[in-house]
Every structure is written in C-alpha cells, then in structure tokens.
Swiss-Prot record:
Keyword field: ATP-binding, Nucleotide-binding
Gene: OPG160
Subunit structure: Interacts with protein OPG137.
GO molecular function: ATP binding
Family matches, as Gene3D superfamilies: P-loop containing nucleotide triphosphate hydrolases
Organism: Variola virus (isolate Human/India/Ind3/1967) (VARV)
Family affiliation: Belongs to the orthopoxvirus OPG160 protein family.
Functional note: Participates in viral DNA packaging and virion morphogenesis.
UniProt KW ATP-binding keyword: yes
Binding locations of ATP: 25-32
Transmembrane segments: none
Protein name per its UniProtKB record: DNA packaging protein OPG160
Amino acid sequence: MNCFQEKQFLRENLLKMPFRMVLTGGSGSGKTIYLLSLFSTLVKKYKHIFLFTPVYNPDYDGYIWPNHINFVSSQESLEYNLIRTKSNIEKCITVAQNHKKSAHFLLIFDDVGDKLSKCNTLIEFLNFGRHLNTSIILLCQTYRHVPILGRANITHFCSFNISISDAENMLRSMPVKGKRKDILNMLNMIQTVRSNNRLAIIIEDSVFCEGELRICTDTADKDVIEQKLNIDILVNQYSHMKKNLNTILESTKTKLCNSDQSSSSKNVSS
C-alpha cells in the first residue's frame, strides 16, 4: 500500500534554511510563472537575488533588479560571472557580520542548458552554498542539465508534467524519505488525475519533508498569471539601482502594455 499523501506546498518552509531547488519541464510548462509566484515569499528573507540566463527574458521585469541579471551565453561567461558573484557574496557576508547582521542570497539559473553540468563553481554552490547563506534554483527542460555531482544535495524537485522516467533518473541521487517506487507511483497518479499543465508537483528531501511521507502540489498565483506588478518584490531586495525604481517600474509597465496589445492584435487577426 502506498502511504504517500498529497499536500499543499508550504512556501514559507523555503525560509527555514538554505535550499537547492530544481524546476523541470518542457517549454511553456509553467516553470517560470511558478517561480515568479514564489518571489513574494522568498523576498522576505532573500534580499540579494541574482539571475543567470543566456538571453533577456521580459518575464523577470519587475522581479529582479537589472544589475543583478547576468547574461551567460557561454561556458566561460557562466563560470566568470559565478566566480565574481561568489566573491561579492563573501564580501557582503563579512560586512553583515561586522554589523552583527545576516545576509542571504538566492541564485537563479534559467535555461542555461548543458553549461550547468560543466560549471565547477555552480557545483561548489550546490554542495557548499549553504555555508554562504546561499540558495539555488535551477530551471531546466530535462534532468540531464542538473550537474551529476550536485544532485545529492537537491532539496526540492519540482516537476511540471514530465515523464516518469525523467523523474526516476532525477530521484536516484536525491535523498528522499520513503521508497522511490512509491513516490513515482504517486507522482504518476497526480499527473494523470490532475491534468493541469501548470501544476507543480514538488518532492522534498528527507529534511524538508519534516518526517512525512508526502508529495506536495502548488499552482502559480493569479496576480502573476495576470501580470499584475507587485512593487514590494523589488523594494524588498537590495540594489544600488533603488534610486531608479520609478523609471524601472514605468518601463516594465510599458512593456507589459505593449505585450497585451500585441496579444490582442493576434487574437483579432486570428
């Protein structure tokens, strides 16, 4: 008998300790929009959020300060930017400690592809980032892009309508509570019964699951889906660009407006 239960994912649990999360699913599966839904929770603790991505993605406008976005089009640029970021994190932690405060950091890697598996600094972050108060989120289309040497330290595996074989391969290294066969059966059952293409199915490691045999589910927030800006998300993050907040928000609103008009035009013409 399968003893696993389906439960609503408690986002606040991500604030308890550093985590390493993988969001896996095909293009358009809802990975990014779900990640953005987590921001209102994450910014309560993580004041320094950095994005690494090969190309500009307008979805992040209004969520991450522009000077914290790193465009990494090659293996070398990813390694270089991560080394610089690590150095800045270490300096920031030293300053915070001198003032008897703590600083927490979040690194997000979106669609970086196979460059992830070859990045030594990323593997260091996955294995030892918790000692630098740093959490990691990887958005991948396939589990193959998750570095093999870092899979044993993944704390949250979020799947978006992926194949059971992909889930099985990912879970081989991840430390989980209970039998992996039961987890996969429950995962398959949820995907079959709850045919929501944007449903996030979250498997936690043996620490974050709080001793329970559970698989969590969650969905993106309505406000995020409707592209409603939440100013507090940027305000709660640290950046030297805060003085330019109004300009950044106006630019974001204009882009969203143009995007809506473009979508409306396409609908009319079709």
